Amino acid sequence: MASLLSPATPTATSAAFHSCSTAGFSTPTHISSQNSSLSLLSRRGCMMRCSFSPQDIPVDSLSHLPPFLDFQNSLATFSDTQKWGFFVSAGIVWFYLTARPGVLIGAIDAYLLAPLQLGLDTLIGRRLKRSDFLVTEKLGEGSFGVVYAGVLLPKNSTLVDDVRVSKARAKAMDFTGEFKQRVILKKVKVGVRGAEEFGEYEEWFNYRLSRAAPDTCAEFLGSFVADKTNTMFTKGGKWLVWRFEGDRDLADYMKDRSFPSNLESIMFGRVLQGVESVKRRALIIKQIMRQIITSLRKIHGTGIVHRDVKPANLVVTKKGQIKLIDFGAAADLRIGKNYIPERTLLDPDYCPPELYVLPEETPSPPPEPIAALLSPILWQLNSPDLFDMYSAGIVLLQMAVPTLRSTAGLKNFNLEIKSVEYDLNRWRERTRTRPDLSILDLDSGRGWDLVTKLISERGSLRRGRLSAAAALRHPYFLLGGDQAAAVLSKLSFSK
């Protein structure tokens, strides 16, 4: 978990999508057949985009609706100038409500989807409890929580309260039989200042992203509060639960001297043949980076800034997906969730020079509905998403330069980059460490150009860095070699 600093601190801050176009819908029969086709194709993993326009809706089908009749009658009383003014105003309002971070979509989520999710979970009995789980082994520990592996017990299973599973027994367990549904559990620390608060925030952000951008983070199953105290649980303590997708994060893989080759078969399904060693490593890093930035683009589109992007918070699934975890430091700048102006949450090794996701003079957020209405203006003026993009640049540099993967190497880099005012080109000329930049220099230095546009100061206009969407349009990604390798590997397995 990130650390806390006060404002008095004297430092400065997927695969290519197929575009499947379908014919316009003209009759209810066509709608039925089209829907069955869409359902079949979606199960096969094809992303559908229907070519549909309002002209395809018969006017007679709306004429019997009272609101439509009232609208037509009101519009008929308008002059041509008034009609133009009405439609222009409606267009501006629509553009504003749908601009990032999504006032309209956020309102639908908050007032419709979130209560609906809670109601459905309660109705079908999906609420979790302590006796549903068997904790197997400890995986790690942070400032505010302890992470464990575990299993979801069958409904007819009985659990002895004081049972403790040894590490050896956990490894010997059959995860294809009775204990087939593995989970990751995080115990929110009890009695630690700030732990309960961050546990609440992490739960909220995981629920929010499970609805808005489910493929960006590990699948969140919910939470429970322990109802009694024993060797593992403390009464009243909160636990968060995710479906098991992998027990190793990017930092774990980067500790291995063979990185990034140790991820080759995971990312591409096989070892790439006929590709030079340096180019193979570059393709692996590019595929990892593409997934990271794609996930950031999606969460930024919801108004959320992670604020703690680093290898330890990027889990690698067994299917070769990179997913964000640990949202305790995240902020939803659409409604001001977990944003407090007088403090900042950061890891000093990965945070940008501005330290704060918004300028220090930004006031405390108003009530949520007002904050949501003002959020598009705040976002356009301050581009808070660029906070995460600096951290993403550090991750790219670490993956590409072996000497920066160690704690000491990264700290030394941060001292050097600060001394040259966060200008990577000047750092390259002056550093005494002689880093190996061969991976970034491939393809006419496209990787180096990208990283210099991520690791930089914001400037007076609070721009100066690429957003996630702009980074994905950079020539480094447009070459698509990593995507081609991934597609070819899937084709070879399907034969």
UniProtKB/Swiss-Prot annotation:
What happens without the gene? Answer: Not significantly affected in state transitions. Enhanced thylakoid folding and reduced mobility of thylakoid proteins under low-light conditions.
Extract the transit peptide range from the record.
Answer: 1-49
Q: What is its main location?
A: plastid
What InterPro entries does this protein's entry cite? Kinase-like_dom_sf, Prot_kinase_dom, Ser/Thr_kinase_AS
Instruction: Name the chemical reaction catalysed here.
Output: L-seryl-[protein] + ATP = O-phospho-L-seryl-[protein] + ADP + H(+); L-threonyl-[protein] + ATP = O-phospho-L-threonyl-[protein] + ADP + H(+)
Location of the active site: D308 (proton acceptor)
Enzyme Commission code: 2.7.11.1
An example molecular function term from Gene Ontology annotations: protein serine kinase activity
- Please list the disulfide bridges: none
GO CC annotation terms, alphabetical: chloroplast; chloroplast thylakoid; thylakoid
Q: Where is the Protein kinase domain?
A: 133-477
UniProt-annotated binding residues for ATP? L139, G140, E141, G142, S143, F144, G145, V146, V147, K186
GO BP terms: namely:
photosystem II stabilization
Q: Where in the cell is it found?
A: Plastid, Chloroplast thylakoid
Q: Which UniProt keywords apply?
A: ATP-binding, Chloroplast, Kinase, Nucleotide-binding, Plastid, Serine/threonine-protein kinase, Thylakoid, Transferase, Transit peptide
This molecule's function is given as: Light-dependent serine/threonine protein kinase that specifically phosphorylates N-terminal threonine residues in psbA/D1, psbD/D2, psbC/CP43 and psbH, which are components of the core antenna complex of photosystem II. Phosphorylation of PSII core components facilitates the exchange of chlorophyll proteins between the grana and the stroma lamellae. Also involved in the phosphorylation of the calcium-sensing receptor (CaS).
Q: What's this protein's family per the entry?
A: Belongs to the protein kinase superfamily. Ser/Thr protein kinase family.
Q: What name appears for this protein in its UniProt entry?
A: Serine/threonine-protein kinase STN8, chloroplastic
Its taxonomic path starts at: Eukaryota, Viridiplantae, Streptophyta, Embryophyta, Tracheophyta
